[in-house]
Amino acid sequence: MNARVEQLEFQAEARQLLDLMVHSVYSNKDSFLRELISNASDALDKLRLEAFRNKDLDVDTSDLHIQIEVDKDARTLTIRDNGIGMTRAEVVDLIGTLAKSGTAELRQQLREAKNAQNEAASEELIGQFGIGFYSSFMVADKVELLTRKAGESEATKWESSGEGTYTIESVENAPQGTSVTLHLKPEDTEDELHDYTSEFKIKSLVKKYSDFIAWPIRMEVERRTPATEEGGEETVTREVETLNSMKALWARPKDEVSEEEYKEFYKHIAHAWDDPLEVIAMKAEGTFEYQALLFIPSHAPFDLFNRDAHTGIQLYVKRVFIMGDCDQLMPEYLRFVKGVVDAQDMSLNVSREILQQDRQIKAIRRRLTKKVLSTIKELQSERPDDYRTFWTQFGRVVKEGLLSDFDNQETLLQLCSFASTHSEEEATTLAQYVERMKEGQTQIFYATGETRQQILKSPHLEAFKAKGYEVLLLTDPVDEVWVGTVTEFDGKPLQSIAKGEVDLSAEGEESQAEREEQQKEFADLLAWLKDTLSDHVKEVRLSNRLTDSPACLITDAFGITPALARLYRASGQDIPVGKRILELNPKHPLVTGLRQAHQDRADDPSVAETAELLYGTALLAEGGALDDPARFAEILADRLARTL
């Protein structure tokens, strides 16, 4: 008896998103079958694991499988599994996927990809957002889902035509597991809508996309036996056939697995639509035996910077699925790596808490990490185009490892690439920077900022450009943090151009005598400015890093920069920023004029106002925020009025 029937509407954003998918954002509509089979496989994995861990769960796991059923007359295709199943609440949550955070972003990106006729990008985005189930609507006018959770008596039926509404109801007498029935659209070769009731078509799709699935995929097929006697009729029978080989790819030698098989396996475990950038197959024997098949994606997922997102490494023990996102197997900064690890000497009853203390898991993690890093190193040296693709997509998170993985810090530094003043187009490694260092240069100079353009306009950079020193341009938020942890590379200290003392006078353009003379000439002004601007600065001194600007602000060698303080505050840590150092260009007309004005009329309020303007312009030039914008604007407006 049916009960609790509800007809609900997709939320506005979800309805628009579904509409985008229904109207051909998939270039390859065949992929819907891969998605449904992958979901069924996941459900079987979960049931086997739950049955092992929960001895009170009374279920039969002796014949777990996926069944494909075709009804040519009704033009329906059903994918059925006897896996874990779902409760009504879980079905509602599945539907809610479309309405969760990120929907607006996905919809916008899909629309842009569609407008640009970039179908591959559209597929990739849908895969990233984990809603491949809805690809069913590319080939079906209506989709029905019937499911019963293992151990529950009540089942749930969900139905939708993809036009803004769906129904959900509770039903009885349904088998355990989940079935998805597609009411297929008419064939349309121009729109790549094939006959998905064709036995040959279904068998070829399973072989192409899902041959490696660990569970048998069965379908009733037609068998024709030729007549044994002349004039007799052929015999037609129907029998159930297993369509897939069920061979675990990670257990097969790499030279026996085709590139296409690896691609399809990656798409299965990563729920991706693009091809992997690199495949890593490993086998370890000895103390800890395990096999691993890892993939470096070619595109970053939308949730790359969401630390709660799944890591993508599946853990098996002797080919038995244990968990789908084993974060203990890969450091957080490599969370984009997808794949499978199959350990041989571990309990099937392992939990996340046990894994955190497991010596074998820690050893496997170390080896996997080193293998991934060495693979990236090979990309860097042997396939520079692929390395550039990798670094563009994942470089920002790899640099997080400089803060946490001290064992591999040197390797990570070698892998990193940075923009620099050497080239507008090409990034540079630290090793390449060191090779280009000027004679007598002992430090690696860098600058941090929000954008390349902002840094290039910074007063701090002036003397470095004038004297031909290359400067690394670091624009990722994580750069502000790791440069405080990493002190050197290849024996060369890393030096911020905006922190501490920088000596660029080694080329002899400015004699020591001239420098000492300037110190005497500006001594009174420096002391007066330190007192006048005492609320803002701790020290005022002459600069050897300025050539065009009148002034700039410097942080102590070991001080916290304002940008770093902002990052800490954004993460909930209120870090106070100490007073900074104001450096003056002794050759700039504004500075020499201020010195003369101070000598002539030190008590004139306008001289103090000029000091405020000088400090404010230095703050603005580096992209900082004024403490009192109204006061600054008032003084500036008064000065401008006097010039007219």
Swiss-Prot record:
SMART domains: HATPase_c
UniProt key word Cytoplasm: yes
GO cellular component terms, semicolon-separated: cytoplasm
Keyword ATP-binding included in the entry's annotation: yes
HAMAP family cross-referenced by the UniProt entry: HSP90
Matches recorded under Pfam families: HATPase_c_3, HSP90
Locations listed in the record: Cytoplasm
Protein name (database record): Chaperone protein HtpG
Family in the record: Belongs to the heat shock protein 90 family.
Region (B), start-end ranges: 353-566
Family matches, as PANTHER family: HEAT SHOCK PROTEIN 90 FAMILY MEMBER (PTHR11528)
CDD domains according to UniProt: HATPase_Hsp90-like
SUPFAM superfamilies recorded: ATPase domain of HSP90 chaperone/DNA topoisomerase II/histidine kinase (SSF55874), HSP90 C-terminal domain (SSF110942), Ribosomal protein S5 domain 2-like (SSF54211)
Keywords, sorted A to Z: ATP-binding, Chaperone, Cytoplasm, Nucleotide-binding, Stress response
GO molecular function list: ATP binding; ATP hydrolysis activity; ATP-dependent protein folding chaperone; unfolded protein binding
Positions of the UniProt region annotated as C: 567-644
Subunit structure comment from the entry: Homodimer.
The species this protein was found in: Mycobacterium avium (strain 104)
Function: Molecular chaperone. Has ATPase activity.
Record region (A): 1-352
